[in-house]
Amino acid sequence: MTFSVAVAGASGYAGGELLRILADHPDFDIRTVTAHQNAGQPLAAHQPHLRSLAGLTLSESTAENLAGHDVVFLALPHGKSGEIATQLPADTLVVDCGADHRLEDPDAWAAFYGGEHFGSWAYGVPELPVGAGRQRERLAGAKRIAAPGCNASAVSLALAPGIHAGLIEDADIVSVLAVGPSGAGKALKTMYLASEILGSANPYAVGGTHRHIPEIQQSLRKAGALSPTISFIPVLVPMSRGILATSTARVKPGVSAAQVQAAWEETYAGEPFVQVLPAGSVPRTSDVLGANTALIGVALDAAAGRVVAVLAIDNLYKGTAGAAIQSANIALGLAETAGLSVNGVAP
């Protein structure tokens, strides 16, 4: 069976990555592409690399244009997805790549986003430990899915094994991320100009203001944390796409380096898209470019009494579009790996 697909926000980076992956998916047929400001223009004017889809024309991002498809992917700014989603049929699988349906706590939404809280949907990080199982069990058969924030999934996947195994403390977590500017979207902003980025590293949203903080805390609570606190520092670096998240947490007394390595390996054993590197190895962003793969290196800093977990993902692939499509595969009962690449692009 082939499922008809519509993608809203198709002229942006996340929308373009969705289309790039979906174009070669064996079970999905792209029927409609929409973009509010660019309606009426050819898709090729905004996504010239998608040659197999060059004949498509962008239409308005309205519920009327999106309804009638089996699957709708929303790659819209926060606030916009929630408005449209309420108008779509209940039997349509809707996957929101924006923030509108990630947070369960309306107070956290009000504090970090503001505006109307549209409620939470099944969270699209299948590998996340939840109780005795995984988040994928909550995605099976779902009709509404919230794809994760790219930074949030990077930190959560990096630290969840230690939380779940009871090896690390959930207070005093520190995460420093090197991130590419594509995570901020295509909208023109001075700080993302090449002349501002090249040859520079630029911290932003410092001091506990980044919107992915409550999402990370929510995921770590699902993994077993009681009251997680995190100092989260993203740093904009001159690479178009990619995240290298270095996260540290206090280790509990008596935990050995072997126990740490084993906990991470056991948590992700058999996972097709999350791989733990051998002890002593750390990942690079170049190793996951263009792949739905997360690579993790973990070590015990015995002198500091902390575990250090380093995770690399492609923010547009595994961090956004790949996670959305992986979750949709699960919801529809397809092979979880369908249409998704585990191999990166090099050089």
Swiss-Prot record:
Record's function text: Catalyzes the NADPH-dependent reduction of N-acetyl-5-glutamyl phosphate to yield N-acetyl-L-glutamate 5-semialdehyde.
Gene symbol of the encoding locus: argC
SUPFAM superfamilies: Glyceraldehyde-3-phosphate dehydrogenase-like, C-terminal domain, NAD(P)-binding Rossmann-fold domains
Any GO BP annotation: L-arginine biosynthetic process
Molecular function terms, GO-annotated: N-acetyl-gamma-glutamyl-phosphate reductase activity; NAD binding; NADP+ binding
SMART domains: Semialdhyde_dh (SM00859)
Lineage: Bacteria, Bacillati, Actinomycetota, Actinomycetes, Micrococcales
Name of the protein described by the UniProt record: N-acetyl-gamma-glutamyl-phosphate reductase
Gene Ontology cellular component annotations, sorted alphabetically: cytoplasm
